[in-house]
Amino acid sequence: TFSENPVGAWELRQPARTERFTMQNKHLLSINDLSRSEVQSLFATAQELKSLRNKRIPHRRLEGHTLAMIFEKPSLRTRATFEIGIFQLGGQAVYFQPHDIRLGVRETVADVAHNMERWFDLIMCRVFTNQTVRTLAENSRVPVINGLCDKEHPCQALTDLFTIQEHMETLSGRTLAFIGDGNNVAHSLMLLCAKVGMDFNLACPPGYEPDPDIVMQAESIAAATGSHLRVSNDPVAMAKGADVLYADVWVSMGQEDEAQD
């Protein structure tokens, strides 16, 4: 967990036994599924587990548990990190390629969820649409993690800000400038930055602005945490004064036909 010092910066400290939080049986579909305190506790847990891994100390907290990894989109990092992560925690992952399931074609997304919940303790999906993620969660009694969809990429945002915090110690009052499309990554980052009190500047090409509904959600959160959100087509203006520059891919997955534009 974290404590707030007199100037408002969040400092990492070891959580007391009574302060342990639980996300048991909770889905992670969006950054909005997490409170600020849950984000802080996740970061503290991640730091603890990373320290154990670096010291080669076993931390098999998911001994005997299984993870289903459902992929409609290929990914090196998503598959590698989830598969290694569950292994280091003592569990086991099963990887499903697109042709293994064919979500919504060979059988409905709901039926897939009903089957998976009987065999697995946890489901991670990397899929085309947010509706697929939602349908899996609505029909599953085991937790579903959004490993990427067209609307959000919450796991990437969490690991990115955790890494930034490792280097800068505090996030509150810092500014992250994102240069790229207003896509799923930008959506999750702007929501998460707002939650932790970090300013977020987004520079995107005309016609590739973020979802207005998500911008409104982030602005509402930012108003409560004292952070600021700016969206512009001017990368130089958005990068000026930033503590972190974040550049995404120039052509988002699924938009390859627009590369020449």
Set out the residue ranges of the language-model regions.
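A short, aliphatic-rich alpha-helical micro-motif
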Residues: E117, A137, M238-K240
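Glycine-rich phosphate/diphosphate-binding loop of Rossmann-like nucleotide-binding domains
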Residues: E72-I84, E166-D248, M253
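Active-site cofactor/substrate anionic-group-binding motifs, chiefly glycine-
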Residues: T66-L67, F71-W119
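Positively charged, low-complexity intrinsically disordered leader regions
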Residues: M23-A80, I84, E152
